[in-house]
């Protein structure tokens, strides 16, 4: 028999009754029932119940074992009594009557419980992550992560993509987020950077003639902590394709992403055909470029109904600025004053002056609008709004006014808030859609200049003609995001592979041809030697997994994450290094400036 086990702790069934077996694992818990000891033995695969009675030669050792000790058990498989069968366990019809128990490794008193799922301080969980990972839910999440990534690889390979690994040590780029820098010992005073994404390398692969590329790519960004991103590193399904339009990228990747969700959604419905929503429409309809489409609320402009009306707050704004708009946020079943007042109070807590509303109710046989706005704009305008928004008795509508560029995010938050409070959101399905036609440029208010809105390597729609003849803020990009349930889960574009168009695009943000050559020399140089039209995308693996397993945050699907202060409490990183190491790297530390 094998030194440690003949079976795993999930393998034994009723057909094994009478067999002599050997198991090894962790003591999940010990129970004493009338002098007989019951030990739940756990390994990676599952749990098996061990029985040690006082007449067994194993009993003396069984009395000493405690939670999370590692033991080996020899014994005979016996069927449980009918009233003792545990239907929650695959091994629940059998138990092992121990004949020998060997302690392989005792455990100290635990700093956090492994049995059960009690809440525990996060820093303790991260410091003792090796114990935390033994807990059932987290262990299951990590295995789901492994299976999802394997499925991504399988699906990409099946449709003709080749996996290539791109360098981890690369050049620093001033674009985007802050780099993690690595000093060079061989080249004093110079630094490598960890890649924020394999963007330039994957485009170079297309120039090199590798038609379809993908990898499970680690990405590193020295960003301030965010709720939706772990400090330090994250992973993406990165891909690129040659000789494609953006429609072909969508048609290629939609079955892959839908298939991943269907495979791991545990029966929850997944969108069959992904909608394609223009960025401008997403902002105006949902107040977000990553809308949760499970929420049925769709906003509309109702400016005309307030122009010249008796509701002077809005009417005066419209009269004084032609760019002012009024947006309506319909709220089916929200037609009570109590709910409307709660929404108004919430708006004030968000720093807004309030949230105007109308709600409709039956007065005899007549449907009437109620609330201060209805009173001020009159019955005819109130009825026109109701008909436009498709509202009935018991429904409400909220209103925001001003410059859409200033208020759209708040309007989107109000839409989300109303949908959640009224239980309009179906949480048991996955709604995916493409957001397309992103703006190529945006106005940087802080620096009073035009800047790239998203990926500077995207091809502008209209190419050189658009760059030379259009208002930069009107130019759209061949850029697209894939969104799911209110999260951006992938982003991509058709790339700008023409050197002269690339230079012109960067000129608009104040960078010269020399700047482009210095900052993106490898890519710019490659484009001089025959670059195919190409495009691709990258899907955020961590976020996809979080959605599929229903985790509340990214730490629940990551093996050894840092905390929100970017500290690795398990390994003690970041840490000081020795003076000798610094000398080797030609690095001298300056005194820390106190803020």
From Swiss-Prot:
Residues 199-202 are annotated as: Aspartate. It is an enzyme of class 6 (ligase). ATP binds at residues 221-223, 488, 540-543. The keyword RNA-binding does not apply. GO terms for biological process: aspartyl-tRNA aminoacylation. The record marks 33 as: Important for tRNA non-discrimination. The keyword Nucleotide-binding applies. InterPro entries: Aa-tRNA-synt_II, aa-tRNA-synth_II, aa-tRNA-synth_II/BPL/LPL, Asp-tRNA-ligase_1, Asp-tRNA-ligase_1_N, Asp/Asn-tRNA-synth_IIb, AspRS_core, GAD-like_sf. Its EC number is 6.1.1.23. It comes from Brucella canis (strain ATCC 23365 / NCTC 10854 / RM-666). PANTHER family: ASPARTATE--TRNA LIGASE, MITOCHONDRIAL, ASPARTYL/LYSYL-TRNA SYNTHETASE. It catalyses: tRNA(Asx) + L-aspartate + ATP = L-aspartyl-tRNA(Asx) + AMP + diphosphate. SUPFAM superfamilies: Class II aaRS and biotin synthetases, GAD domain-like, Nucleic acid-binding proteins. Homodimer. This is Aspartate--tRNA(Asp/Asn) ligase. Aspartyl-tRNA synthetase with relaxed tRNA specificity since it is able to aspartylate not only its cognate tRNA(Asp) but also tRNA(Asn). Reaction proceeds in two steps: L-aspartate is first activated by ATP to form Asp-AMP and then transferred to the acceptor end of tRNA(Asp/Asn). Disulfide bonds: none annotated. L-aspartate binds at residues 175, 221, 454, 495. It is found in: Cytoplasm. GO terms for molecular function: aspartate-tRNA ligase activity; aspartate-tRNA(Asn) ligase activity; ATP binding; nucleic acid binding. Belongs to the class-II aminoacyl-tRNA synthetase family. Type 1 subfamily. It comes from the Bacteria. The lineage of its organism: Bacteria, Pseudomonadati, Pseudomonadota, Alphaproteobacteria, Hyphomicrobiales. CDD domains: AspRS_core, EcAspRS_like_N. Keywords: Aminoacyl-tRNA synthetase, ATP-binding, Cytoplasm, Ligase, Nucleotide-binding, Protein biosynthesis. Pfam families: GAD, tRNA-synt_2, tRNA_anti-codon. GO terms for cellular component: cytoplasm.
């Amino acid at each position: 028999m094998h030194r440690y086990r003949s079976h795993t702790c999930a393998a034994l069934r009723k057909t094994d009754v009478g067999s002599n077996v050997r198991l090894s694992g962790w003591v999940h818990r010990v129970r004493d029932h009338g002098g007989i000891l019951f030990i739940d033995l756990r390994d990676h695969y599952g749990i098996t119940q061990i029985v040690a009675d006082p007449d067994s030669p194993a009993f003396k050792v069984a009395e000493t074992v405690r939670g999370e000790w590692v033991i080996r058990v020899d014994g005979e498989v016996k069927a449980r009594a009918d009233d003792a069968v545990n239907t929650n366990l695959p091994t629940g019809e059998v138990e092992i009557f121990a004949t020998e128990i060997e302690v392989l490794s005792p455990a100290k008193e635990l700093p956090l419980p492994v049995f059960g799922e009690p809440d525990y301080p996060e820093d303790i969980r991260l410091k003792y992550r090796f114990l935390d990972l033994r807990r059932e839910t987290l262990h299951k999440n990590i295995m789901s992560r492994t299976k999802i990534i394997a499925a991504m690889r399988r699906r990409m390979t099946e449709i003709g993509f080749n996996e290539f690994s791109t360098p981890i040590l690369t050049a620093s780029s001033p674009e985007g987020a802050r780099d993690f820098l690595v000093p060079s010992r061989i080249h004093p005073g110079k630094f490598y950077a960890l890649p924020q994404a394999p963007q330039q390398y994957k485009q170079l692969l297309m120039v090199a003639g590798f038609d379809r590329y993908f990898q499970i790519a680690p990405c590193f960004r020295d960003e301030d902590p965010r709720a939706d991103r772990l400090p330090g590193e994250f992973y993406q399904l990165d891909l690129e394709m040659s000789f494609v339009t953006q429609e072909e990228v969508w048609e290629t990747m939609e079955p892959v992403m839908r298939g991943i969700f269907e495979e791991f959604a545990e029966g929850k419905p997944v969108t069959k055909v992904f909608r394609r929503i223009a960025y401008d429409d997403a902002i105006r309809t949902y107040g977000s470029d990553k809308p949760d489409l499970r929420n049925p609320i769709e906003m509309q402009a109702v400016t005309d109904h307030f122009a010249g009306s008796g509701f002077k707050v809005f009417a005066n704004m419209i009269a004084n600025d032609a760019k002012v708009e009024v947006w309506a946020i319909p709220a089916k079943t929200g037609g009570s004053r109590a709910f409307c007042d709660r929404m108004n109070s919430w708006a004030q807590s968000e720093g807004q002056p309030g949230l105007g509303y109308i709600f409709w109710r039956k007065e005899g046989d007549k449907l009437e609008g109620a609330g201060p706005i209805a009173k001020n704009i009159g019955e005819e305008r109130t009825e026109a709004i109701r008909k436009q928004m498709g509202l009935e008795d018991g429904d409400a509508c909220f209103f925001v006014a001003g410059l859409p560029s200033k208020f759209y995010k708040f309007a989107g938050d109000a839409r989300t808030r109303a949908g959640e409070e009224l239980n309009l959101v179906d949480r048991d399905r996955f709604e995916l859609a493409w957001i397309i036609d992103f703006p190529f440029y945006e106005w940087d208010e802080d620096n009073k200049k035009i800047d790239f809105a998203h990926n500077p390597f995207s091809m502008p729609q209209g190419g050189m003609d658009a760059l030379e003849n259009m208002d930069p803020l009107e130019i759209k990009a061949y850029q697209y995001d894939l969104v799911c349930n209110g999260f951006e889960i992938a982003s991509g574009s058709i790339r700008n592979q023409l050197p002269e168009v690339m230079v012109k695009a960067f000129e608009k943000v104040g960078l010269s041809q020399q700047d482009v050559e210095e900052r993106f020399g490898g890519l710019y140089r490659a484009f001089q030697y025959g670059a195919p039209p190409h495009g691709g995308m990258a899907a955020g693996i961590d976020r996809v997994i979080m959605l599929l397993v229903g985790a509340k945050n990214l730490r629940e699907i990551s093996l050894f994450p840092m905390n929100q202060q970017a500290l690795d409490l398990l390994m003690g990183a970041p840490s000081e290094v020795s003076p000798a190491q610094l000398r080797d790297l030609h690095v001298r530390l300056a005194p820390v400036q106190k803020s």
